[in-house]
Swiss-Prot record:
Gene that this sequence comes from: napB
Listed name of the protein: Periplasmic nitrate reductase, electron transfer subunit
GO BP terms: anaerobic respiration
Lineage of the organism: Bacteria, Pseudomonadati, Pseudomonadota, Gammaproteobacteria, Pasteurellales
Molecular-function GO terms, alphabetical: metal ion binding; molecular adaptor activity
Main location: periplasm
Residues annotated as transmembrane: none
Keyword Iron listed: yes
Gene Ontology cellular-component terms listed: periplasmic space
Post-translational modifications reported in the UniProt record: Binds 2 heme C groups per subunit.
Coiled-coil ranges from the UniProt annotation: none
Subunit field text: Component of the periplasmic nitrate reductase NapAB complex composed of NapA and NapB.
Function (record text): Electron transfer subunit of the periplasmic nitrate reductase complex NapAB. Receives electrons from the membrane-anchored tetraheme c-type NapC protein and transfers these to NapA subunit, thus allowing electron flow between membrane and periplasm. Essential for periplasmic nitrate reduction with nitrate as the terminal electron acceptor.
Record-listed heme c 1 binding positions: H70, C84, C87, H88
Signal peptide segment: 1-26
Amino acid sequence: MINMTKQVSKILAGLFTALFAGSLMASDAPAVGKDLTQAAENIPPAFHNAPRQGELPALNYVNQPPMVPHSVANYQVTKNVNQCLNCHSPENSRLSGATRISPTHFMDRDGKVGSSSSPRRYFCLQCHVSQANVDPIVPNDFKPMKGYGN
Protein backbone atom coordinates (compact mmCIF):
# COMPACT_ATOMS: atom_id res chain seq x y z
CA MET A 1 0.00 0.00 0.00
CA ILE A 2 2.83 2.39 0.88
CA ASN A 3 4.61 1.47 -2.36
CA MET A 4 1.46 2.19 -4.33
CA THR A 5 1.03 5.59 -2.63
CA LYS A 6 4.62 6.52 -3.52
CA GLN A 7 4.04 5.50 -7.12
CA VAL A 8 0.82 7.51 -7.35
CA SER A 9 2.60 10.53 -5.81
CA LYS A 10 5.41 10.24 -8.35
CA ILE A 11 2.93 9.92 -11.22
CA LEU A 12 0.94 12.95 -10.04
CA ALA A 13 4.12 14.99 -9.58
CA GLY A 14 5.20 14.04 -13.09
CA LEU A 15 1.82 15.01 -14.54
CA PHE A 16 1.81 18.40 -12.81
CA THR A 17 5.37 19.04 -13.96
CA ALA A 18 4.46 18.12 -17.53
CA LEU A 19 1.36 20.33 -17.46
CA PHE A 20 3.30 23.27 -16.05
CA ALA A 21 6.18 22.87 -18.51
CA GLY A 22 3.73 22.44 -21.38
CA SER A 23 1.91 25.65 -20.54
CA LEU A 24 5.23 27.51 -20.43
CA MET A 25 6.21 26.17 -23.83
CA ALA A 26 2.80 27.00 -25.30
CA SER A 27 3.02 30.65 -24.29
CA ASP A 28 4.00 33.14 -26.98
CA ALA A 29 7.70 33.40 -27.60
CA PRO A 30 9.21 36.89 -27.35
CA ALA A 31 9.32 38.73 -30.66
CA VAL A 32 13.08 38.62 -31.11
CA GLY A 33 14.30 40.90 -33.85
CA LYS A 34 10.91 42.50 -34.51
CA ASP A 35 10.71 45.48 -32.15
CA LEU A 36 13.69 45.91 -29.90
CA THR A 37 13.05 49.56 -29.07
CA GLN A 38 11.96 48.60 -25.56
CA ALA A 39 14.87 46.21 -24.91
CA ALA A 40 16.77 47.11 -21.76
CA GLU A 41 19.90 48.21 -23.62
CA ASN A 42 17.88 50.62 -25.79
CA ILE A 43 16.25 52.54 -22.95
CA PRO A 44 18.62 55.37 -22.04
CA PRO A 45 19.08 56.30 -18.40
CA ALA A 46 17.51 59.54 -17.26
CA PHE A 47 19.71 62.56 -17.91
CA HIS A 48 18.97 65.69 -15.93
CA ASN A 49 20.27 69.26 -16.05
CA ALA A 50 21.64 69.09 -19.57
CA PRO A 51 23.36 72.34 -20.51
CA ARG A 52 21.72 74.55 -23.07
CA GLN A 53 22.85 74.03 -26.62
CA GLY A 54 25.63 76.42 -27.40
CA GLU A 55 29.34 76.61 -27.91
CA LEU A 56 31.58 73.64 -27.25
CA PRO A 57 32.91 73.27 -23.71
CA ALA A 58 36.63 74.05 -23.45
CA LEU A 59 39.09 71.16 -23.80
CA ASN A 60 41.25 70.30 -20.79
CA TYR A 61 44.10 68.41 -22.47
CA VAL A 62 45.61 67.66 -25.87
CA ASN A 63 43.56 65.22 -27.97
CA GLN A 64 40.61 65.29 -25.56
CA PRO A 65 37.47 64.23 -27.44
CA PRO A 66 35.14 67.24 -27.60
CA MET A 67 32.25 67.12 -25.16
CA VAL A 68 28.70 67.24 -26.49
CA PRO A 69 27.02 70.62 -25.82
CA HIS A 70 23.50 69.20 -26.07
CA SER A 71 21.46 66.35 -24.64
CA VAL A 72 21.70 62.99 -26.38
CA ALA A 73 18.69 61.56 -24.57
CA ASN A 74 16.85 59.12 -26.83
CA TYR A 75 19.59 59.21 -29.49
CA GLN A 76 19.99 55.81 -31.05
CA VAL A 77 23.57 54.69 -31.63
CA THR A 78 23.66 51.01 -32.53
CA LYS A 79 25.49 48.90 -35.09
CA ASN A 80 22.69 49.67 -37.56
CA VAL A 81 21.83 53.30 -36.74
CA ASN A 82 23.89 56.28 -35.62
CA GLN A 83 21.68 59.32 -35.12
CA CYS A 84 24.69 61.55 -34.40
CA LEU A 85 25.57 61.32 -38.10
CA ASN A 86 22.22 62.89 -39.02
CA CYS A 87 23.85 66.24 -38.17
CA HIS A 88 27.59 65.58 -37.83
CA SER A 89 28.46 63.61 -40.99
CA PRO A 90 30.48 65.58 -43.57
CA GLU A 91 27.46 65.81 -45.89
CA ASN A 92 24.91 66.80 -43.23
CA SER A 93 27.12 69.13 -41.19
CA ARG A 94 27.08 71.66 -44.04
CA LEU A 95 23.28 71.82 -43.84
CA SER A 96 22.86 71.50 -40.07
CA GLY A 97 25.70 73.79 -39.00
CA ALA A 98 26.87 71.11 -36.56
CA THR A 99 30.55 70.33 -36.03
CA ARG A 100 31.75 67.87 -38.68
CA ILE A 101 33.28 64.64 -37.41
CA SER A 102 37.06 64.65 -37.48
CA PRO A 103 38.94 63.19 -40.47
CA THR A 104 40.61 60.82 -37.97
CA HIS A 105 37.24 59.06 -37.66
CA PHE A 106 37.67 57.80 -41.24
CA MET A 107 41.06 56.13 -40.62
CA ASP A 108 41.39 52.43 -40.02
CA ARG A 109 43.91 50.97 -37.59
CA ASP A 110 46.61 51.10 -40.27
CA GLY A 111 46.07 54.83 -40.87
CA LYS A 112 44.36 54.36 -44.24
CA VAL A 113 41.56 56.85 -44.87
CA GLY A 114 38.26 55.39 -46.06
CA SER A 115 35.07 56.92 -47.42
CA SER A 116 32.97 56.12 -44.35
CA SER A 117 33.62 56.32 -40.64
CA SER A 118 35.81 53.59 -39.22
CA PRO A 119 34.08 50.93 -37.10
CA ARG A 120 36.52 51.86 -34.32
CA ARG A 121 35.09 55.40 -34.26
CA TYR A 122 31.44 54.69 -35.12
CA PHE A 123 30.06 54.60 -31.56
CA CYS A 124 30.40 58.32 -30.74
CA LEU A 125 29.24 58.07 -27.14
CA GLN A 126 32.25 55.94 -26.18
CA CYS A 127 34.37 59.10 -26.17
CA HIS A 128 32.06 62.08 -26.64
CA VAL A 129 29.84 62.63 -23.62
CA SER A 130 27.10 65.07 -22.71
CA GLN A 131 27.72 67.33 -19.78
CA ALA A 132 25.35 68.17 -16.95
CA ASN A 133 25.22 71.29 -14.80
CA VAL A 134 25.52 69.63 -11.40
CA ASP A 135 27.73 69.97 -8.34
CA PRO A 136 30.67 67.53 -8.34
CA ILE A 137 30.30 64.43 -6.18
CA VAL A 138 33.94 64.65 -5.07
CA PRO A 139 36.25 67.67 -5.09
CA ASN A 140 38.22 68.07 -8.31
CA ASP A 141 41.64 69.73 -8.24
CA PHE A 142 42.41 69.02 -11.91
CA LYS A 143 44.16 71.90 -13.68
CA PRO A 144 43.95 72.02 -17.48
CA MET A 145 47.12 72.25 -19.54
CA LYS A 146 48.28 75.77 -20.30
CA GLY A 147 46.32 77.07 -23.26
CA TYR A 148 43.41 74.69 -22.63
CA GLY A 149 40.33 74.94 -20.45
CA ASN A 150 38.84 77.98 -18.84
